[in-house]
Amino acid sequence: MTTDPAQAPTRARSQHQRRKRIVQAAAALASRGGVEAMQMRTVAERAGVALGTLYRYFPSKMDLVVAVVSEEMDLLEGSMERRPPGSSTPASRAVELLMRATRGLMREPELADALIRSLLLSDVKTNFGSRMTGMLLRVASEGEATDGQRTLVGALNSVWVMEMIEILRGHATPEETHERLDVAAQRLLADF
């Protein structure tokens, strides 16, 4: 059985659209009831795919959570490219990006909580930290970043993750988080 090479782009587009529907269905369920609401059978039904198809794309629920996080990161990167942080200092540009991410996540607090909890408790390797660090480096550094700068920006990213946890637990407001991120960024990125 041979396949027509002319059909390959159509098949790839169809697979991409199917994957996108699955991720969107999972995100919608998580935003209403956390990761617990992301039952694989329910995700498959909402996405209009067979359960076996869902498992072919995402062998576990955690793989699906990682895909949802990746989609959120794509949205943040797109936002940053369309509207780069305009602040005058590296520290304030980094904080502007982190607060943009915070506002984006807090539009769907159930989803944010589900994603952060799952990532913290998961054994699945993700590139979330390195992607966020990369975005922070792009807005904060001028030119090629040094290893020391990568370490400092990674530390700022870790502060932000903890601040997100505090917001989600109801122990901090976005305003308090903004203040603390300002202080941390000013100190960590002082030599950028």
What are the functions of these language-model segments?
Residues M1-G33, A37-R46, D63-V66:
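Basic, helix-initiating cap at the start of DNA-binding domains
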Residues Q39, A112-I116, E176:
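Short, hydrophobic secondary-structure boundary micro-motifs
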Residues G48-F58:
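Short hydrophobic/aromatic patch on the recognition helix
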Residues A67, G78-R107:
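Hydrophobic alpha-helical connector segments
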Residues E77, E96, L119-I165, E175-L189:
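Amphipathic alpha-helical packing segments from all-alpha helical-bundle domains
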